[in-house]
Structures are given as structure tokens and as C-alpha cells.
């Protein structure tokens, strides 16, 4: 008998246990009935996993979770929801998120915020992969708060930086600037994290310029130089000095040259390339308005 056929037998057995509800209730076997059904659903789910029938495996784990909830173990229910989500993630994102949220509800009720944060971050990553940046931002914020409450500062900052990244893509520059400056300030006094400050300063200043706030960018750059003396000698700082001046002068050629020089040594990622193109477009608009 193949795995799928065996899985179907376990599903049928679980369904049969649940249909026998009234008889078991009369003799006090209700909780055991749900636990036994959950066990059968779990066996079916594992067989479906072996056959890579991900949706069917996810559905069986989800049914097991629902049985555990009605039975004696909310902990086992949460674990089954997580297993269901792992299967659904292969192609059914909405159901994966639903299951993760169900697991998180249990873990937060139990005060287990570290594991809640981990699964909330998974939800954010699923939304990110789907290109739903608004939902990703909201989910990363919840995860960041959970991590922060557990004093997992690095993990909290990783989530915040994702929010900053997507906020800038959505042209919510003030939010991005706020986060980059917040994370930079928190990183300055730690030898393991202060190296990242030049990147946060660069991104924050680029957001000022993308918002067509040259004066704000100038003031911010000076503030960053004062916050971290070593920033003055970095390529990031020299790039910002150069492109801010180019923006001041509405000089597209100088701007392009500054960016090209930086890119020849430190290749630009897609986010910076996108933001720099927006800044260049603001210079072009200013030049056209003068003409």
C-alpha cells in the first residue's frame, strides 16, 4: 500500500473517531477521542509530507491542531499549527499565515514572546515574498516589538531595518529616516555593531534627498559626522558630500560622476540604485523648471 493510501486510511480513522462523539461523551472519553484523532491526522500528515503533497499535509496537520485544541493540549495544537504552516509555505501562503497566527496566539498567551517573535518574523517574510509590503511592515513591527521585549536587540533591529527598507520603497521617507537614525544611535557604543553606522547614515541621507530635502540632508550629514568621527573618512560620507553639492547646484553630471566613482569601489545594491535614480530625477525636474 502506498503512502497516499495509508494517509487516507488514517484520515478516515480520525474522521470516524470524531463522528463517534456522542457515544464517547456518555462514557467520559471525549478528550481521549480528540487526542487519538489528532494522532491519526498527524500520521496522515507525515505520510503526505513524504509524498510531497504539501497542501494535503498542511490540511491534516491543521486538523490535528484543531483536535488538540478541543482535547487536552494547546501546546501540541500550537506545534501542529507550525507544522501545518511549514507545509503550506510550499505554495499556499494565506493558509500558512493563518496557521502561524494561530500558533502565535497560543505562545503569546503563555508569555513565550521569543518564539512568538520568530514566527511573526516568518509571517513578515511571507508577506515580503508576496510583495505585500504594507502587511510585511506591520508584521515586522510586531516581531520587532516582541524581540525588543526579550532584549534581543540585534533581531529587533533587523526587523526595523526591513521596515525602513520597504518604507523608502513606498516613499515614506520620514519613517525610514527615523529608523535608520534610531538604529545607528543604538549601534554607536557597541564595537560589534558600530561598523554598520556608515550604512545607516548613508541610507538616511539618501532618503532626505529622495524627499527633495537638500537642507535636511546637509544638516543630517553634519549631525552624523558629529555622532561618529570616523564616519568623516568613509566613502559613504564622501559620496554624500558630493551628491548633496550636486543637488545644490542642480548638476546632473556631477551627481552621476560621484555615484559612478562610489559604485566602482562599492557596488550599489538595488535599493540604493532605485533611491539614487529618484534623486537624479528630482535634479532633472529642478533643471527643467529653471529652463
Swiss-Prot record:
Pfam families: SNAP (PF14938). Interacts with nsfA and probably SNARE proteins. GO terms for cellular component: cytoplasmic vesicle membrane; phagocytic vesicle; SNARE complex. TPR repeats lie at residues 14-51, 77-110, 117-150, 157-190. GO terms for biological process: intracellular protein transport; SNARE complex disassembly. Keywords: Cytoplasmic vesicle, ER-Golgi transport, Membrane, Protein transport, Repeat, TPR repeat, Transport. Its main location: membrane. It is a peripheral membrane protein. Belongs to the SNAP family. It comes from the Eukaryota. This is Alpha-soluble NSF attachment protein. InterPro entries: NSF_attach, TPR-like_helical_dom_sf, TPR_rpt. It is found in: Cytoplasmic vesicle membrane. GO terms for molecular function: soluble NSF attachment protein activity; syntaxin binding. May be required for vesicular transport between the endoplasmic reticulum and the Golgi apparatus. Involved in vesicle fusion with nsfA and probably SNARE proteins. CDD domains: SNAP. The keyword Transport applies.
Amino acid at each position: 500500500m502506498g503512502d497516499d493510501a495509508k494517509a487516507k486510511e488514517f484520515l478516515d480513522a480520525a474522521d470516524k473517531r470524531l463522528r463517534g462523539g456522542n457515544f464517547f461523551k456518555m462514557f467520559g472519553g471525549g478528550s481521549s477521542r480528540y487526542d487519538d484523532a489528532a494522532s491519526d491526522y498527524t500520521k496522515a500528515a507525515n505520510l503526505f509530507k513524504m509524498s510531497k503533497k504539501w497542501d494535503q499535509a498542511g490540511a491534516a496537520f491543521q486538523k490535528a491542531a484543531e483536535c488538540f485544541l478541543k482535547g487536552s493540549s494547546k501546546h501540541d495544537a500550537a506545534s501542529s499549527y507550525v507544522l501545518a504552516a511549514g507545509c503550506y509555505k510550499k505554495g499556499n501562503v494565506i493558509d500558512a499565515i493563518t496557521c502561524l497566527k494561530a500558533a502565535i496566539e497560543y505562545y503569546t498567551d503563555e508569555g513565550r514572546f521569543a518564539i512568538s517573535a520568530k514566527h511573526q518574523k516568518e509571517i513578515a517574510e511571507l508577506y515580503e515574498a508576496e510583495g505585500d509590503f504594507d502587511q510585511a511592515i506591520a508584521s515586522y513591527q510586531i516581531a520587532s516589538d516582541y524581540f525588543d521585549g526579550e532584549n534581543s536587540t540585534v533581531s529587533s533591529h533587523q526587523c526595523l531595518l526591513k521596515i525602513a527598507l520597504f518604507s523608502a520603497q513606498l516613499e515614506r521617507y520620514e519613517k525610514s529616516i527615523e529608523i535608520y537614525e534610531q538604529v545607528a544611535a543604538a549601534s554607536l557604543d557597541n564595537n560589534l555593531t558600530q561598523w554598520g553606522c556608515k550604512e545607516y547614515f548613508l541610507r538616511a541621507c539618501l532618503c532626505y534627498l529622495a524627499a527633495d530635502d537638500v537642507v535636511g540632508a546637509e544638516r543630517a550629514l553634519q549631525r552624523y559626522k558629529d555622532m561618529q568621527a570616523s564616519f568623516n573618512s568613509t566613502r559613504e560620507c564622501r559620496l554624500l558630500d558630493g551628491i548633496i553639492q550636486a543637488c545644490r547646484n542642480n548638476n546632473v553630471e556631477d551627481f552621476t560622476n560621484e555615484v559612478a566613482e562610489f559604485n566602482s569601489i562599492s557596488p550599489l545594491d538595488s535599493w540604493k540604485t532605485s533611491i539614487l535614480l529618484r534623486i537624479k530625477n528630482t535634479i532633472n525636474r529642478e533643471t527643467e523648471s529653471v529652463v
